[in-house]
Each structure stands twice: as structure tokens, then as C-alpha cells.
Amino acid sequence: MDSSSEKLSPFELMSAILKGAKLDGSNSSDSGVAVSPAVMAMLLENKELVMILTTSVAVLIGCVVVLIWRRSSGSGKKVVEPPKLIVPKSVVEPEEIDEGKKKFTIFFGTQTGTAEGFAKALAEEAKARYEKAVIKVIDIDDYAADDEEYEEKFRKETLAFFILATYGDGEPTDNAARFYKWFVEGNDRGDWLKNLQYGVFGLGNRQYEHFNKIAKVVDEKVAEQGGKRIVPLVLGDDDQCIEDDFAAWRENVWPELDNLLRDEDDTTVSTTYTAAIPEYRVVFPDKSDSLISEANGHANGYANGNTVYDAQHPCRSNVAVRKELHTPASDRSCTHLDFDIAGTGLSYGTGDHVGVYCDNLSETVEEAERLLNLPPETYFSLHADKEDGTPLAGSSLPPPFPPCTLRTALTRYADLLNTPKKSALLALAAYASDPNEADRLKYLASPAGKDEYAQSLVANQRSLLEVMAEFPSAKPPLGVFFAAIAPRLQPRFYSISSSPRMAPSRIHVTCALVYEKTPGGRIHKGVCSTWMKNAIPLEESRDCSWAPIFVRQSNFKLPADPKVPVIMIGPGTGLAPFRGFLQERLALKEEGAELGTAVFFFGCRNRKMDYIYEDELNHFLEIGALSELLVAFSREGPTKQYVQHKMAEKASDIWRMISDGAYVYVCGDAKGMARDVHRTLHTIAQEQGSMDSTQAEGFVKNLQMTGRYLRDVW
């Protein structure tokens, strides 16, 4: 390089470029600014840097031009606001209603989907009857983001129906809990619902003491706050045929809606309505394109790595420990299971419930495949819309599960062992090639066949597979089978039998095996209890069993003050939450807390067969986490003894503890034990407290209302 050549700074080069200097030494008479030979030489010497700078200038000029163009082209438009934050719940947005159109809203509170199905069925028939009406079906939890919005929106409602299930011992369903708390416990609003006409249908089970409590309370509260009831409250009983109860209530609805919604020129209300059979659109894709979906897919997804776990987003959890709790002398079985939640972010509280999704037994799945007459490797996907993306007719289809084989679908997603609903019988009838079988199915689903359906199917606990075997010509397509015949397999709930103070990375479950002969003669094997009994724990194999699980919070909690005395009553697997309670008390004691008296009434058949967790209970007793343990053995000695008998023997002690502020907890069977314990508690209050029957009843009810008498029953 010539020693006389100079290096230009970027600034000097840029100045030269902007003045129009040419690098090829062309005649200065061309458009441009003349530059001296020295400058030209310097530019040529720094040619690479010049190219970088010229490119940068071109890009800069281009950006400026685009900005000017966009600003000028948008000058006459409204400024776009930044998007709002995403709200976890999809709150229903208000929609504009054409003037002159009448509207009503159907709210549902559901745990297993039945109430939602009823709400959508009511809406579909109403749309067919009243073409000019605007009808909305709303998950009551999605109606509003907060209490203030609930009140604001309800004030605008003029016609509404509430289809509400009661869950457990008089509790609202998960999706109705927030609404129920606001509506029942809120401030006195006077007759703020005076413009609302309404009706309520409840879903419950008469075997529970607080039968249909949620529907009763909502119906009463709406009336108290000015609402006008246009149809009587009907309490559906799932212990019988709740479809018949809903059908009867629905028939009361139509005359009232005719008066409110029918126009003089509206003739649609007089036409006979026939409900369409729900059906998914089915696609049979190339399985090789979806192997990942088949391996990892689940109807509800998995939420590992996220912060929110619920029934729709469960947490995949390995089985860490499994052990049998009964002795070899027992002819029954009870399984203890540890779910490993370390590193998942899933947490729980003492007294909470765990929901577990389990697979159907292979023998059950194989029978279903045989009845459907389809190969198990059939790979398909379900869709609730048409190919062009528009929704299929009707709106009662539940969200479809991911693409999978028929075997996977029947294993994970189909409830095959419960008694089929009448709507399922009608769907089977529509695809029965034998006219006699079709007629028989239609009869069982009809009002005329009500008694025979109740006796032949419900009372005998006939399963869906048994019914399909009885009517072999019924071969529904997959879209109908999964939409209208086989309900979605539901999670099983268990009282958690551990405390996070003692087992922060494990959820313990105590599960009795369900293995019994039905009245119809079939051997019924519980889906989840059988799976748990056969689960392979991590301590035995790295290829261990796992299940999608989630935690459901409960109000079944120890008093905030550990010095408050507690009375616990729970025979059999009713011991589960109390094992967690005692672990909690032990941890508190080890931390130096002062504990109040704790008495536990436990019951089992025989000390040598089914006295579960005996060593642990004795340890809690010895170390002081438990003050007194009273065990009733129903199969030892000449007479059967149950927990209520032990309670009667300790009546004076129980009354003294209650008088000192004790909390009373009951866990176990709702149909027998819980009722007997409740009656015994009533008797103790009456006799020990010198009360008459009415006073004793009021006393026990007050214990419940103040949260000192809590039940976890099933």
C-alpha cells in the first residue's frame, strides 16, 4: 500500500458520500459534486467501509420513507389501543340484542357435565320453538370476573333459568362455588331482582343429607330478593332417573315461555320437537403424522411446568409407593398409594381432595372393541365443527379429545360401566339394524317404559356394555358413540391421607377396592380402585405406573388454633383425612405448639384383617398427637359394634368437649354411617344438654353453620 494514502474516518466518508462523490473517477460534469483527486483516492482506498456505509444509509432512508407513508396513510384512522391483559377465565362478553327480540339466559353449575348437558338441551329445544328469541347458555363461573360484575350483569337479566348440581355434602360444584359464595353470603340488596323471572332445576342424590341444597338455596334467595318464580323448583334425583325429573320440569317450562316469548304469528311452538342425536365429525388421518399426539395427548392436557393445575390441566404424577393395608386373612383389599409431586409445582393442604384420572381395565376395553366391531388400532380424530369451520348443528357436544387409536379412546376417555342414559338408548336405537331391537330401545327410553327402565337397568346396575351386548345389531359410528352414548370418563376423588408438613412432595391416597356383584349378577370392578391395586410403584420399577392428578381444595380443615379440641369420626377409609390431621398435629407438636385434646372414633370389621394404619395410630397416641383412640369392631364378638355405639358410650365426654368449643369431623359413607353418626350427635345434644328434639336439632345445625361440624362424605 502507498505510504501516502490516508485512512478516512467514518464521518468523513459519510460526508463525502452525501456530497455525491463517485468512486469510479467519472467526469465531474455528471450530476454530482466535484471532488478532488485526493478525496477520490481516499474513497477508493476505503472502498469496503464505503460499501457498508452506503448500505446503512439506504436502509435508513427506506425506514424513514415507510414511517412517513404509514403515518400519512393512517392519519384519518382511529389510534389503535394496546391489547388488554388476558384474563384466565373467559368471561362472557355482552352481546348486542336486536331491538324487538326477546332473550333469556340459562345458567349451569356442573361437576360431571350432566347439568351442562341439560342446559344445552333446553336451549336447543327453545331455539327450535322460539326462532325470534335470543337464548344464551352460560357457565355461571364464566359470567363475571368478580362480585361487582356479577351484580351489574344480574341486574340486567329479565328471564333466566338455573340448572345447578349439588356436589358432595351440600357443596356447590367447582364452577358454581364463586357465584354461590357471592350470591348467598353477599350484602342485603333488597328486591334488586324484581325484574327477573326465573326457574330452577336441581341435580342431586337423595342418599345425601343435604339433598339438592344448592338449588334450594338459590331458588329461595332469588325469590327473597324480588325474583318472580315462573315454574316450581324441581329437585332431580340421580339415585333414580334424573332424566325423567328434568323432562318433567322442562314440560312445565314451555307453557310459561309460550306466554312470554311467543308472537301471534309464531307457529313454531306448535310443532313437535325431536332432539337431534349429537355426533362428532370423524376424520381418519394418517397415524404416522400424529405419533407425538398419540404418545403425549390427553383429553385435558398435562400442566407440568405451569402454575395452574385443575381438572382440565392435571399433573402427570408417578406412583412412588404402593402397599396393601389389609392382612392376608382379609377377603377384601385396601391400597395405600403415594403420588410423587416433587418438582411439579403441584401443592396441597391437609384435608384436601385429589382427583385421579385412571384407565379402564383392558378386559373392559376389549369387550367394547368387540361390540363396536372395529379394530383397536383404528386411528381417528373428533371434531365439533364442519370442514369449513362452522359449528355442527346443536351445541351440546363436549370438547373432543386428541387424535388417538380406538383402544386409547376407550381406555382413557369412555365411561363404559355406568348405566346408559335414556338419550344413549335412543342413539343406539337409531343405529340398530334389527327393527325389534330398535323398538325395544325406544320403549325403554319412553315415558311408557319408565318403570321397566328403572327396574331393568337402574336397579340392576346394568352397564353400557351389557346393554350393547343385549342389542347386538346396534352399531353406532364413532362420532355418535363418543358424543351421545359413552359419557366422558370422570376423575375419581379421594380424601388425601397425608399432610404437606410431613410429606410435602407426596400425596397419599387410601383406597378400598371395589369388587362386588351387582343385582343383575355382573361382577363390577371399580375402575380406579382396581388400577391402584395393580399399580407398579417407582420403588419396584423405573417403568412405573402414573396418572394425571389434580388437587381440589376442601373446607375440611383443622381449627386455626391447635389448642382447640377436635373429635374425629371415620371408619374404614374414612380414616384417610384424619391420618393427615394427625400428621399435621404431630408436626405442630414437634415445632413446639400446644395441642388441644384430640379423640378419634375408628371402625373396622376385625382387628386381624382390616385394622388399617394400626401401628401409626398407636404411634400418634404414644407421642401425644392423639389423646384417645376408640375402635369399634363390627365382626368381633356376639354383636356388631359401630362408631356410633362408641360415641354413645362416650356421650358425656363428647358433650363436654363440644361445650369447650370442640370441632366435630365425620368422614366416610354418606348413606349409612354419616346418618347414624348425625342422629347420635343429635341424641347426645338432647340428653346431655337437657334439650327437646327441636332444640337439639337447632343446636346441631348451628354447629354446622358456624363451621364446627364438618363432614367429608361420599
From Swiss-Prot:
Enzyme class: oxidoreductase
GO cellular component: cytosol; endoplasmic reticulum membrane
Keyword set, alphabetical order: Endoplasmic reticulum, FAD, Flavoprotein, FMN, Membrane, NADP, Oxidoreductase, Transmembrane, Transmembrane helix
EC number(s) per entry: 1.6.2.4
Residues bound to FAD: 492-495, 510-512, 526-529, 714
Gene Ontology molecular functions: flavin adenine dinucleotide binding; FMN binding; NADP binding; NADPH-hemoprotein reductase activity
Amino-acid positions noted as binding NADP(+) in the UniProt annotation, renumbered to this chain: 332, 573, 634-635, 640-644, 676
Domain Flavodoxin-like: 104-254
Record-annotated FAD-binding FR-type domain positions: 312-559
Pfam families: FAD_binding_1 (PF00667), Flavodoxin_1 (PF00258), NAD_binding_1 (PF00175)
Cytoplasmic side: 70-714
UniProt-listed InterPro entries: CysJ-like_FAD-binding (IPR003097), FAD-bd_FR_type (IPR017927), Flavdoxin-like (IPR001094), Flavodoxin/NO_synth (IPR008254), Flavoprot_Pyr_Nucl_cyt_Rdtase (IPR001709), Flavoprotein-like_sf (IPR029039), FNR_nucleotide-bd (IPR039261), NADPH_Cyt_P450_Rdtase_alpha (IPR023173)
Keyword Endoplasmic reticulum: yes
Annotated coiled-coil segments of the chain: none
Cofactor: FAD; FMN
Membrane topology: Single-pass membrane protein
Gene3D superfamilies, alphabetized: 3.40.50.360, NADPH-cytochrome p450 Reductase, Chain A, domain 3, Nucleotide-binding domain of ferredoxin-NADP reductase (FNR) module, Translation factors
Cofactor note: Binds 1 FAD per monomer. Binds 1 FMN per monomer.
Function recorded in the entry: This enzyme is required for electron transfer from NADP to cytochrome P450 in microsomes. It can also provide electron transfer to heme oxygenase and cytochrome B5.
Protein name as annotated: NADPH--cytochrome P450 reductase
Species this chain originates from: Catharanthus roseus (Madagascar periwinkle)
